[in-house]
Curated annotation (Swiss-Prot):
InterPro entries: Atg5 (IPR007239), ATG5_HBR (IPR048940), Atg5_HR (IPR042526), ATG5_UblA (IPR048939), Atg5_UblA_dom_sf (IPR042527), ATG5_UblB (IPR048318). Gene3D superfamilies: 3.10.20.620, Autophagy protein Apg5, helix rich domain, Phosphatidylinositol 3-kinase Catalytic Subunit, Chain A, domain 1. Conjugated to atg12; which is essential for autophagy. It is a peripheral membrane protein. Signal peptide: none annotated. It comes from Sclerotinia sclerotiorum (strain ATCC 18683 / 1980 / Ss-1) (White mold). Pfam families: ATG5_HBR, ATG5_UblA, ATG5_UblB. The keyword Transport applies. This is Autophagy protein 5. Conjugated with atg12.
Length: 266
């Protein structure tokens, strides 16, 4: 499944105020918009440093995750601007370190990796080279010690009811500016991150439904069925019975994080 995810792409329709001609491109779901800056600067003849959608400055997240969050019509029409410039390399490596720390209780895996392997990891993302990426990620995902926690981030629309607030101490927030667009896209969201063990207290494999129920019990009252909300990952609805560790190994983004987006049911 991981190779199929890396092969999937999002069609983009990129515009700049200086030109009436758009830049059309298919971008891998696991890639980052910032990697397009050199070719876009050359195409439009203008220095560019940010992307926006419906007036909202897009964060430095994987393209597929941004698409899952905002749920735009395709091709996705985004605008170029001169907002704050992200250091995409440092951002990516720091995120890899965070995921490594979450899995093992330390970041020794990535910190002890050779410079050659570290460079190959980053280059594989830039080049969408799954073969090289898989070789390096296999090292990170199979340390000598047992897996401690799953690097899981839950993106929750802020319009969710107050009663769906996660367990105290388990959440952070990340909000985009409000907009007059229809409320269905997740224009404003919270990012929830907490410690999820790969097994339950009864030593059973932890499922996605079990994790959601433990973090957001009111929003996900059942461990087996989506009653009030469901989650999407890489553009697809994920069954609650899916084993979390299997998802981590097959469907994490290139930085090692399993990013799921909550979608409220009618």
């Amino acid at each position: 499944m991981q190779s199929l995810i890396w092969a999937s792409a999002i069609p983009l329709y990129i515009t700049h105020s200086s030109s009436t001609i758009p830049y059309l491109i298919n971008v891998p779901r696991v890639s980052y918009l910032a990697l397009l800056f050199p070719r876009l600067t050359s195409f439009f003849g203008e220095n560019v440093s940010s992307f926006s959608y419906e007036g909202i400055l897009l964060k430095n997240l994987p393209v597929g995750l941004l698409c899952d969050l905002y749920q735009p019509e395709l091709p996705w029409r985004i605008e170029l601007g001169d907002g704050p410039l992200f250091d995409i390399h440092d951002t990516f490596i720091n995120s890899v370190k965070e995921a490594d720390f979450m899995r093992n209780g330390n970041a020794k895996g990535i910190m002890s990796m050779s410079k050659e392997h570290s460079t190959q990891l980053w280059n594989s993302v830039q080049d969408n080279d799954f073969s090289t990426y898989h070789k390096i990620s296999t090292i990170l995902l199979n340390p000598a010690t047992a897996l401690k926690h799953i690097p899981l981030r839950i993106y929750l629309p802020s319009s969710s009811t107050p009663s769906s607030t996660p367990h105290p101490g388990s959440s952070g927030s990340s909000k985009a500016p409000s907009t007059a667009s229809p409320p269905s896209p997740l224009f404003t969201f919270k990012t929830i991150q907490t410690l999820i063990q790969p097994q339950t207290t009864s030593r059973e494999p932890q499922t996605l439904g079990g994790a959601l129920n433990s973090v957001l019990p009111t929003l996900f009252p059942s461990k087996r069925d989506a009653i009030l909300a469901e989650v999407i990952l890489h553009g697809a609805t994920v069954p609650f019975k899916a084993v979390l560790e299997d998802l981590m190994r097959e469907a994490s983004y290139a930085d090692g994080w399993l990013n799921v987006c909550v979608v409220m049911l009618n």
